[in-house]
């Protein structure tokens, strides 16, 4: 595997993904029963924004740094505040020097009774993840292929929870594999929330992926996409598919995505899309 997230930590795609992740976690913790978070491609856990990788690309300056500095309308600012406060907690002082990956961000919003299973196969990232999670009894780092993990850890003993699937998309068949795997996973644990991240580079592949999910029989599928426009670099747009989203999440994203896109857009073609593939139209 050649993908290294340290080059991209805190970029627009991370901001988009993690802002939505935090909203989901806040909904899950509204009920007292414990929940499980399964992160199939968890990465290293914590990223140094002053290190050579992040400094080389500077992507975080056009992502999290822009959003932190931007004035937002009160309603959108309120929805984004828990995410921004969590990010700030990893960098003492005013300057942003570290950016948490999904596992550490999730733990900020999990309670004593909740559990995290964070999976990462790549050896150096897996070792870093284990160090990042060490000492937290709620978290388990597992050196396992994320696709294998879905079969191994579903269903968990908890009835409620979130499965985050964020693969590196290095293989040509990643979209078809993702569609097949997520439907199989949902059938094993139909009460869980599923959050799937994907890059938008090949519109035909993305369309086929959305069509396969829409025809899958899963009852509620919400799609959100955010594009920062031409000239933004190798990745100009990303999407999220949300299966069984919390019932108020769609309304929150209607409020949040437009101002977020306006802050993050860097060129022509920027904007967002939010629609139901199945269910609540």
What annotation goes with each model-predicted range?
Residues 1-281:
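Class I S-adenosyl-L-methionine-dependent methyltransferase catalytic core
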């Amino acid at each position: 595997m050649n993908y290294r997230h340290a080059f991209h930590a805190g970029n627009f795609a991370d901001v988009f993904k993690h802002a939505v992740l935090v909203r989901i976690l806040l909904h899950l913790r509204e009920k007292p029963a414990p929940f499980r978070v399964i992160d199939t491609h968890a990465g290293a856990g914590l990223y140094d924004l002053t290190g050579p990788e992040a400094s080389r690309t500077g992507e975080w300056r056009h992502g999290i740094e822009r959003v932190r500095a931007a004035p937002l309308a009160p309603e959108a600012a309120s929805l984004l505040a828990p995410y921004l406060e969590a990010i700030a907690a990893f960098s003492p002082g005013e300057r942003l020097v570290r950016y948490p990956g999904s596992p550490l961000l999730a733990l900020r919003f999990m309670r004593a009774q909740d559990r995290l299973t964070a999976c990462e196969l790549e050896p150096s990232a897996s070792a870093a993840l284990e160090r990042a999670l060490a000492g937290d009894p709620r978290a388990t780092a597992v050196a396992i292929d994320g696709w294998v993990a879905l079969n191994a850890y579903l269903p968990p003993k908890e009835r409620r929870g979130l499965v985050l699937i964020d693969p590196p998309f290095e293989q040509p068949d990643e979209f078809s594999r993702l569609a097949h795997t997520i439907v199989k996973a949902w059938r094993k644990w139909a009460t869980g929330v599923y959050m799937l991240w994907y890059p938008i580079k090949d519109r035909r592949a993305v369309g086929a992926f959305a069509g396969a999910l829409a025809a899958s029989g899963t009852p509620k599928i919400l799609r959100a996409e955010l594009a920062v426009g031409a000239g933004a670099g190798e990745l100009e747009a990303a999407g999220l598919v949300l299966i069984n989203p919390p019932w108020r999440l769609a309304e929150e994203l209607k409020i949040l995505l437009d101002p977020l896109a306006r802050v993050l857009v860097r060129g022509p073609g920027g904007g967002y899309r939010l629609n139901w593939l199945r269910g609540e139209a």
